[in-house]
């Protein structure tokens, strides 16, 4: 699939859940000879992250409309129009053959600008319930893809592009068979941590005693307080780190994960082939619940929603999973994953550019 001379503009911003899958597709297509530029906003994570990956980035001024008050809503049409004009000028100069919208506020004006210039718009929805921007853009898109079934009624399910180091992990049977000793529990609340897990897991550790060993990612600024909580619970032996740079190594170490269920986390856990206890973030549209549901239905995970979360609920769940059960769940997780998601998205981008 040679893309010699073809030009792609990726539109993604705000959070890692939008940006990292976009980077995976960008690198895949760059290896095929494509030129790639990025459309983002100057005050979000993409501004620093994308240039580190050798990709030039253009900025437009746009932010979210949710919960901003009446003045912001009145000003919204003008802000969107100005952002559309900025995006249109950028695209007229760059002349992409196709644009790929991965979500975030930047995709809205960017997608409209591409459509107004006759440039094919390809969309990828990472979450189990569609975001507002992608709902709007789906009406004008050349192709709509989704990571999990249910975000769009008729869109192709292609999974989420995940990092190659996670995809390269040995399969569960090779990795987990023959493991003995305490069950290795990886606790991850996302890069920001999750206060509810930071508060709950030290007490869970006290209940489970030496049947588990825990590696707990606390999130920025929380390492000391979480270490103290484990010590006060009589469990100082467990490892607490603020951030985990090498998630593939953490997944390779773990027997089971206790975590939030952001789209990328769920897809990585499936690709790694790991059982999980998901505690979805309480978003009003239950986005993280819908992300986790396919793995629970596959018998690879359990969901405990935050109102039902307790020390006993977590401790009893983990205590009830034997090593044999964990291996079966791990194999089901891997079977439910879509390891070639990056290639699938890239192929649709190529197809749209040729159309």
UniProtKB/Swiss-Prot annotation:
Single GO biological process annotation from the record: cell division
Localization of this protein: Cell inner membrane
Catalytic activity: di-trans,octa-cis-undecaprenyl diphospho-N-acetyl-alpha-D-muramoyl-L-alanyl-D-glutamyl-meso-2,6-diaminopimeloyl-D-alanyl-D-alanine + UDP-N-acetyl-alpha-D-glucosamine = di-trans,octa-cis-undecaprenyl diphospho-[N-acetyl-alpha-D-glucosaminyl-(1->4)]-N-acetyl-alpha-D-muramoyl-L-alanyl-D-glutamyl-meso-2,6-diaminopimeloyl-D-alanyl-D-alanine + UDP + H(+)
Pfam families: Glyco_tran_28_C, Glyco_transf_28
EC top class, as a word: transferase
Single GO MF annotation: UDP-N-acetyl-D-glucosamine:N-acetylmuramoyl-L-alanyl-D-glutamyl-meso-2,6-diaminopimelyl-D-alanyl-D-alanine-diphosphoundecaprenol 4-beta-N-acetylglucosaminlytransferase activity
CDD domains: GT28_MurG
EC code(s) of this entry: 2.4.1.227
Keyword Chaperone applies: no
GO (cellular component) term, any one: plasma membrane
The UniProt record lists the keyword Cell inner membrane: yes
Alphabetically ordered keywords of this record: Cell cycle, Cell division, Cell inner membrane, Cell membrane, Cell shape, Cell wall biogenesis/degradation, Glycosyltransferase, Membrane, Peptidoglycan synthesis, Transferase
Record-stated family: Belongs to the glycosyltransferase 28 family. MurG subfamily.
UniProt protein name: UDP-N-acetylglucosamine--N-acetylmuramyl-(pentapeptide) pyrophosphoryl-undecaprenol N-acetylglucosamine transferase
Species per Swiss-Prot/TrEMBL record: Shigella flexneri serotype 5b (strain 8401)
Name of the gene: murG
